[in-house]
Amino acid sequence: MFENIPNVKLGLIAVSRDCFPRTLSEMRRANIVKAAKGELYECPVTVENENDMLKAVADVQAAGCNALVVFLGNFGPETPETLIAKYFDGPCMFVAAAEGDGDLINGRGDAYCGMLNCSYNLGMR
């Protein structure tokens, strides 16, 4: 009926800085996918470096995604996470996890601070 509305297949790529637990980003990514109730493609590749970034972009492209959410489940690696936007041919939105589960030992990810660095790095690209 409405042919002028784009058909969006949204993908979710989680990123993680290697000095933080990778499982923190993966757990938080899974929680987002669960809340989205199947309306989101979950990329199984967690990006910590440039090689992971290339694998993740190839994965979401192969899955037919035409828009992305790049999710900082913890601080995140500034260069690889921002290169996702360069290599993915479509819109990318960057979001960061909130600290809120009370686990300040294994659950602290400093994603807000990572988002500040990410924003600065995106501005340089």
Tell me what each language-model feature is.
Residues 1-125:
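An N-terminal assembly and electron-transfer interface module characteristic of large anaerobic redox
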